[in-house]
Regions:
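Terminal transmembrane helix and immediately flanking juxtamembrane interfaces
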Residues: 1-250
Length: 250
């Protein structure tokens, strides 16, 4: 059996190859959407009508990618609780909790705004609302940090009289224009490598219970979906640099 280092190199190489070839394809055939451009992000992907995975409403994006850490957590815990006693170690739980903290720091909170949000702002990003007309309106960054819905009635100073808005209209602002690190690539890579690492103890024991066998199958399936999702993200979303910085942050 290959040593742990070799297995890790192979896993990272597979993900790198998927990301590289997907990104090259997106550049050669102009299939990617620049998600940091406020003039484009509110529009459907230009290939949405002909490429199924170019639409953000596809089931894998809605039910898996956006909830990937939840799936990862469930798969790992199912595997850990059904593992043979000799491999059900506290060290494995510690690894999970460490990665959970990393995920939260990058995506949710880092002494205020998350690290991803800080990167966008530090690289020139602004908090932007997309009006129904497609025009972007810049608002204070705090609106994006708090993720609150902005409506003209409560924030009249943000909207000029030249904008005609439908009654009851409101929008949640997003950070745009800066370097929008691909959170999907970051999270999917984190999930795939973690689950791969956590499968290794299972393959070192000779016999599994039926429940643990099911857990292993589920973990392998989720790794497969993560790899596929990295591929679709590489082909259809984010600029090449944004995708590779999402990968390199690991």
């Amino acid at each position: 059996m290959m040593d742990t280092r070799t297995q890790s190199v192979i896993a990272i190489s597979i993900i790198s190859a998927i990301l590289l070839f997907g990104t090259l394809y997106s550049v050669v055939y102009n299939t990617y959407l620049d998600t940091s451009n406020p003039l484009l992000t509110h529009l459907p992907h230009h290939l949405a009508k002909t490429h199924y995975f170019a639409t953000k409403s596809n089931p894998i994006n809605v039910y898996f990618i956006k909830k990937a850490w939840g799936w990862t957590s469930a798969a790992f815990l199912f595997s850990w609780f059904t593992s043979p006693p000799q491999i059900r170690s506290i060290n494995r739980i510690s690894k999970y909790l460490t990665l959970l903290m990393i995920w939260l720091l990058f995506t949710s909170w880092f002494f205020g705004p998350a690290i991803f949000e800080r990167v966008i702002v530090a690289s020139g990003g602004q908090c932007v609302i997309s009006l129904p007309s497609g025009d972007p309106v810049v608002v204070p960054n705090d609106f994006c940090y708090r993720k609150i819905t902005v409506i003209p009635e409560t924030n009249p100073t943000l909207f000029t009289s030249t904008f005609t808005l439908p009654p009851g209209w409101g929008a949640v602002p997003r950070l745009r224009k800066g370097h929008d690190v691909s959170g999907h690539v970051f999270l999917l890579t984190l999930s795939a490598l973690f689950l791969f690492d956590q499968l290794r103890p299972s393959f070192r024991v000779a016999q599994w219970s039926p429940l643990h066998q099911l857990a292993v199958i589920i973990n392998i399936a989720i790794i497969g979906i993560c790899l596929f999702s990295i591929g679709t993200t590489a082909v259809y979303f984010h600029s090449p640099l944004e995708k590779f910085t999402g990968f390199r942050k690991l």
